[in-house]
Amino acid sequence: MNIIDQVKQTLVEEIAASINKAGLADEIPDIKIEVPKDTKNGDYATNIAMVLTKIAKRNPREIAQAIVDNLDTEKAHVKQIDIAGPGFINFYLDNQYLTAIIPEAIEKGDQFGHVNESKGQNVLLEYVSANPTGDLHIGHARNAAVGDALANILTAAGYNVTREYYINDAGNQITNLARSIETRFFEALGDNSYSMPEDGYNGKDIIEIGKDLAEKHPEIKDYSEEARLKEFRKLGVEYEMAKLKNDLAEFNTHFDNWFSETSLYEKGEILEVLAKMKELGYTYEADGATWLRTTDFKDDKDRVLIKNDGTYTYFLPDIAYHFDKVKRGNDILIDLFGADHHGYINRLKASLETFGVDSNRLEIQIMQMVRLMENGKEVKMSKRTGNAITLREIMDEVGVDAARYFLTMRSPDSHFDFDMELAKEQSQDNPVYYAQYAHARICSILKQAKEQGIEVTAANDFTTITNEKAIELLKKVADFEPTIESAAEHRSAHRITNYIQDLASHFHKFYNAEKVLTDDIEKTKAHVAMIEAVRITLKNALAMVGVSAPESM
């Protein structure tokens, strides 16, 4: 249990003991401890006096006074209590208890903020899963940054997380890829008789693949059409996936599993789920097609599984894939989808219900659109005209750290304008620069301290830490683990970036208010240890969103 929760629990226990001592209630109702919006109203507050009004049959202010009169303030670290308004009890704490977070952070190091106990739940987090038909763009970048950060957060919160990329290497888009490569392949050999398919891929990468295959495998031209397209499907996916994996690795995004859609066909899992759904009575035939009764499970309409030409819809392999996730022993399934996949939520949840799987185990986050902005104007993207702004170009333009930080600053369900000019600025207006500069500034101070013979572990007395800005800074450090817990619970990576900004801000305010290195050696030791705790917290928080913590800038 973190230090904040310990203090809250102690307050609850002491309030309960006080209620008993005052004889206000035989059965004590739930005691809620809140943080007042205005810090002038104390560190914590409770409305328990008003809750007890009917039970105790007394005025709430009288009840509040009785609680205060019987409270053991020392155990709860309380230095002052006010009764406000109709009966709110405001607690002002002796903030020396906060200094216990300093040696804890230093001792735990990279693990500070992480929950020690396992949640005992397996989470399969699927993200990015871009079709292997071209370069990654800004939408994929947001998905990658948020997904990877969320995986880090859930891991820190005690979940067993598997990071998975679903390779869409079957279906019409791969046939179109193969046809597009075929056209470019023969063009490279001087044969322009093969026209680009209507839904083909016109990017420069396809031209490059065609040229490369023409140089390395000219014999493919002599294959039968069926064998040739099969080879282009296979080689095309290999080329595209190698490039995607390389870009994602450079973007500091890594996966435990690369799950192939084709494997679902090879292992017979699609036929298996189809047979099972038929057996359970959830399918029917209409208009020459096979349908799934998803309306039985709150979907707005039934969905086609097999079209009237005998081909599968995208939905059928998606069902097989999600059922496979369940069979692998995952308790929670989290999908991060693009903005164009909103209609998939109800149908996927309904498909799991057909197998008796609680659909609440599937959580789907929709990544809203990102607009790339430069000099106040939107930079347009068009994947199929060859003019797309790729992830690689974004990394080259603003850097991995800035890209990842900016893309995790907002809730994924909100539209976001990515200001590339701001992301490149080396000023405190740039959020990632502001955060990293705080870390670098601390490292500089610690280096000076070491030159003076002061180590971060030298302090054993923190009573000299009394400055208001220092206390606020320590409160923020102590709030790191609760923030991770909250971010994990709400699946919200942006809570961590918000926390980083607040922590950096509190540090800069402290730095501007009080010198760390002074002639008072004991105070200096305490401050050096404190800013080391801040540095560790800042570094760990930045790592959670995949951003580095430079020691100098």
Swiss-Prot record:
The keyword Aminoacyl-tRNA synthetase applies. PROSITE patterns: AA_TRNA_LIGASE_I. It is found in: Cytoplasm. It comes from Staphylococcus aureus (strain NCTC 8325 / PS 47). This is Arginine--tRNA ligase. NCBIfam families: argS. InterPro entries: aa-tRNA-synth_I_CS (IPR001412), Arg-tRNA-ligase (IPR001278), Arg-tRNA-synth_N (IPR005148), Arg-tRNA-synth_N_sf (IPR036695), ArgRS_core (IPR035684), DALR_anticod-bd (IPR008909), Rossmann-like_a/b/a_fold (IPR014729), tRNAsynth_Ia_anticodon-bd (IPR009080). Pfam families: Arg_tRNA_synt_N, DALR_1, tRNA-synt_1d. Its main location: cytoplasm. Belongs to the class-I aminoacyl-tRNA synthetase family. Signal peptide: none annotated.
